[in-house]
Amino acid sequence: MRTLHDLPAPAKLNLFLHITGRRPDGYHLLQSVFMLIDWCDTLHIELRPDGGISREDMGAGLPADDLCTRAARALQAATGTRQGAHIVLEKSIPAQAGMGGGSSDAATTLLALNRLWGLGLGRTALERIGLSLGADIPFFLRGRNAWVEGIGETIMPLENVHALPQSRFVVVKPEAGLDTKSIFSSPSLERNSERATISGFAAAHYQFGKNVLQPVAETLCPEVSEAIRWLEHKGLQARMTGSGSAVFAQMTHAIDLFDLPTGWRAKVCDNLRLHPLAGWAADED
């Protein structure tokens, strides 16, 4: 096997996002539910026996040292393999959206190279490597919708009685993006949310809680407010995902997207029960 084609890297939505406190080192303590959706980037990876790591963009340009290449190099460093890879990335998930596109690309890269290079690492080992690159990467490696706490390191799959109902969502990405650091450094950010429970979330699901980053984001980026109003005018209840600037709403009825403002992107998405590559790494090392 020398090439892996059409590898999906799905986006996520934060169904709610609360901040319950702050650690002495300054990191915020979060509670959230991460949900996979079928808005995906696509990767194609070819084996390079010379040990080099290269990347080719099909679409919007990315920095040369993006999370895909960093993930590949981190996997090389962790295992000592002398194999390399050429990564072709087809971007579809918007950047600066709060949808985890870069983290998902990195997770798919780790899963694919673990297979292509014949490393045989289990999911726990891959998660350790992923966490060194970004807090959201372990979630995508787990490959299941999850309740997430702490700084992102506590991940509890929502399965069985807590599984998310199958539903359809519309996701809107305004033209403007947002810088995560500017939101978390804002003095007006709510940092004392009451701790939520999984049972409380399960009683309300898509109507539960709020995104405490949203008020700050709306101040920094008025297009977030405009996107929420655009969906509300169509009779849907909208909120922001992650640190924005994308917003989303559960589709309780069909809507038209023909009047989407110039420069915005919108997509109707289904939630996913499992990451398409969820079976590519064993749960135990």
UniProtKB/Swiss-Prot annotation:
> Keywords assigned by UniProt?
ATP-binding, Isoprene biosynthesis, Kinase, Nucleotide-binding, Transferase
Would you identify the family this protein belongs to, as annotated? Belongs to the GHMP kinase family. IspE subfamily.
Gene from which the chain derives: ispE
Name the source organism: Paracidovorax citrulli (strain AAC00-1) (Acidovorax citrulli)
Documented EC number(s) = 2.7.1.148
Question: Pathway listed for it?
Answer: Isoprenoid biosynthesis; isopentenyl diphosphate biosynthesis via DXP pathway; isopentenyl diphosphate from 1-deoxy-D-xylulose 5-phosphate: step 3/6
Pfam families recorded: GHMP_kinases_C, GHMP_kinases_N
Question: What InterPro entries does UniProt report for this protein, alphabetically?
Answer: GHMP_kinase_C_dom (IPR013750), GHMP_kinase_C_sf (IPR036554), GHMP_kinase_N_dom (IPR006204), IspE (IPR004424), Ribosomal_Su5_D2-typ_SF (IPR020568), Ribsml_uS5_D2-typ_fold_subgr (IPR014721)
Q: Which GO terms describe its biological process?
A: isopentenyl diphosphate biosynthetic process, methylerythritol 4-phosphate pathway; terpenoid biosynthetic process
Where is ATP bound in this sequence? 94-104
Q: Return one GO MF term.
A: 4-(cytidine 5'-diphospho)-2-C-methyl-D-erythritol kinase activity
Q: Which SUPFAM superfamilies match?
A: GHMP Kinase, C-terminal domain, Ribosomal protein S5 domain 2-like
Active-site positions on this chain: 12, 136
Q: What is this protein called?
A: 4-diphosphocytidyl-2-C-methyl-D-erythritol kinase
Catalysed reaction(s) here are: 4-CDP-2-C-methyl-D-erythritol + ATP = 4-CDP-2-C-methyl-D-erythritol 2-phosphate + ADP + H(+)
Q: Does the keyword rRNA-binding apply?
A: no
